[in-house]
Amino acid sequence: MKAFLITLIFALFTMGATAQEIYKIVYQNAEQVLNNPASGVTKARIAQFKVSQLTYLRQKAFETMPEVTDRFLDVQAYYLSEFMTFYQSELVKSNKETPEERAKKVMIFLDATVSNPLFGDTDEETIYAYIKEGTELTPFSLDTDWQKALAAVKAQLK
């Protein structure tokens, strides 16, 4: 299912999808997971983060940018999905590692989101809401340039 979604998103991205098509697909898929009682806790927590992040992205973009393009929202949504997929695959791989190694890997992802802000938002209560709890499966900043964050993580994990 994930592979299909990523392939679909990539196909739409490269074919010049209609306005906000990728953003809408990622958002709607996350909402479907949240609204499906059969979704497991892990899937629901990841979906909740995606919905929160995409809602924040759209709201902040319209607040701070004179002109928000569909491409801007689509690119961020695409790289958010790529980042989350890569994060999940790295967590699965790290099951065989020590708890310290696993925590170090999570910190690489967390640091990439904090170190690559998109808007420079100073409202730490909002942007770090998923970090401050300390128990989140997705301990990431909402104010993130997902394309840069993904590149930063991949560079560190080479």
Annotate each language-model stretch with its function.
Residues 5, 67-71:
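Short alpha-helical "patches" and their helix-cap loops
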Residues 71-156:
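Surface-exposed, polar helix/loop patches in the mature regions of secreted/periplasmic/lumenal proteins
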Residues 1-22:
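Bacterial Sec-dependent N-terminal signal peptides
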Residues 4-7, 28, 32, 91:
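Generic alpha-helix detector with strongest preference for long hydrophobic helices that associate
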Residues 20-67:
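Immediate post-signal-peptide N-terminus of mature secreted/exported proteins
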Residues 12-15, 25, 29, 51, ...:
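Intrinsically disordered, low-complexity regions enriched in small/polar residues
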Residues 5, 9-10, 39, 63, ...:
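Intrinsically disordered, low-complexity repeat segments enriched in small/polar residues
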